[in-house]
Amino acid sequence: DQKSTKIVLLSDLHLGYHNRRSDFRKWVDMINAEQPDLILIAGDIIDNSVRPLMEENVAAEFHRLTAPVYACLGNHEYYSNQPKARRFYREAGITLLQDSVAKIGNLCIIGRDDRTNMQRKSLAMIMEEARKKGFISDLHHGKSSDEFLVLLDHQPYHLEEAEQNGIDFQFSGHTHHGQVWPVSWITDALYEKAYGSLQKGNTRYYISSGMGI
């Protein structure tokens, strides 16, 4: 029997002048209490500036997490200066997946760049590169039966791409559905799924309303 893997999924922490280190400290305690094997974050860790995270040494709180952290970028990482955001990810010990793939046992984590970058790679291109590197086998529509493919893509547009590329599970955020009125009406109109779970073919999806705003 294969050991199950416990994953904590987060999105949209928006750490900065509003959500401070003291807030994040409580979230870290909650996450550690779950005793996860892995932590995945679907973008927008940073709000609008890296400065308050540096001033409060928020990276130290990330180092208290008891499981490895993998994350993709969100649009706010671009608003806050993407090179500085990438530097913060490194200092915080976060493995950034930016149109790239990580393999952990039979689990394959694909992290897309945010669609703010109009030159980001297509999901099909990322998958093809992963196959060439041996991260994903060429069997059964791009993966073997014991592989599980997880996609992190901050903004939940074009959900059909994950299904078309054999993804097992996509995790997204961005919408903040239900957190601010009347944003929920707008997000329901903009996205095929603005919050919660969805299944398309063999692909399951979850769109998070996020931790902070």
Please give the residue ranges for each predicted region:
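Soluble catalytic domains of enzymes that build or remodel membrane lipids, polysaccharides, and related
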Residues: 2-213
